[in-house]
Amino acid sequence: MARIARSAGGRAGLGVLAAALLLAACSNASSHVSKGGAGAPGVTANKIVVGSLASATGPLSSGFGEIVDGVKAYFDMVNAHGGVYGRKLDLAVQENDAGNPTTDAAEARTLVSDHVFAVVGVGTPFFTGAQYLAQVGMPTFGYMVSSDWDNSPTLFGAYGSYLNDATAQYDVVYAARQLHATSVAVVSYGVPASAAACEGSASGLQRAGVHVSFEDFNFGIGGNPVPDVVQMAARHVDLLITCMEGSDNLAFARAMHQYGLGSAHAFWFNGYSRKMVADNPSLTNGIIYFDQHVPFEAVTAFPGKYPAMALYLEEMTKYEPQWVYDDVAFQGWVNAAQFVAGLRAAGPNPTQRSLVAAINSETAFTAGGLMPPVNWTKAHTIAGSTRGPFCSAFVEAENGRYVPVFTRPGGQVFACVNSSFQPVAAPPGTPGA
């Protein structure tokens, strides 16, 4: 699951939150960045050799390592159809940093010394290798959970490359208004990776005129939710916003049922799990998540409306069935799609520099129809992350399964607002529009 920030994806992962506790300040903003190397290492007459850098093992591997599986599935699909300009895509160098910042920096150098053309599939809580990869102009694609990706034209996150926690407020305000919430509680852990988005959401709710009756931005991981829930019950909370991981969210749901708040909705930034919902149907009823991509459930809800997601589900089921409904694996698929789109635009004789230039001239990348358009002429900077419109899809747990909610006429799953929280039309190219 992704960290809470629009550019990074829709959900905060326990791995990121735990990482924040272990190493709170691990950002390496680049002092120098390249526009891409002039050469074409790893490119031969019949293949393009790339690498990946993920936390495949170690205490923080869950929620990061599976990005590589999404990349593999997309490459397998492309290779089955002849590759790109007759070259097969070869994910030959798969480095594992085991969630260790020092190892990550070393493995980034290993990838360069191994002469890979690009790094496709970065999934790690500590991307300390970002600065070096940016300096040498290595095209790099991955799951963005830190500001290490900011302002580097060769680094490409799945949904943009500038981390901005403040953008979470737009989804929260939209959901609160759709639910006609009158008393909102907001709860997070006491670490920036969790608290920043929830604090921004509370501020946005208040700015939008939605009453926030209870706040706790210092809840402890694995703590007792009852004291908070007792106060929430006294204030008649009808919507809970949480920036926590799945088991703590479930503990809050259980306590809310015990103290008379079982009919309240909850907006969880993290915790999307088909198994958890199926195992706890009554506790999870009314839980809402937001997606920056077409929800997996939209294929069933709106047959034929979202062919790109249908293709994703089909190909992932074929090549990586364990990870079909995993959001980090999905981001790996998007990373691979971005890489391939750039290769095709760069032409039959690509260099690292021409690949980067091709992607950074793209103004409406949707991964073939999976997400609202990303404008790469702006998506590396804070200006691009705050411009809007802000579009998301929403799913709700109902009787042990997820269903799309807040949909528009004709099965449009994306709802968009401007910086004043006013509904606006989806940008051209948005799936389902």
What are these regions (language model features)?
Residues 1-14:
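Bacterial N-terminal signal peptides that target proteins for export
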Residues 36-72, 94-101, 188-196, 324-331:
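Extracytoplasmic "Venus flytrap"
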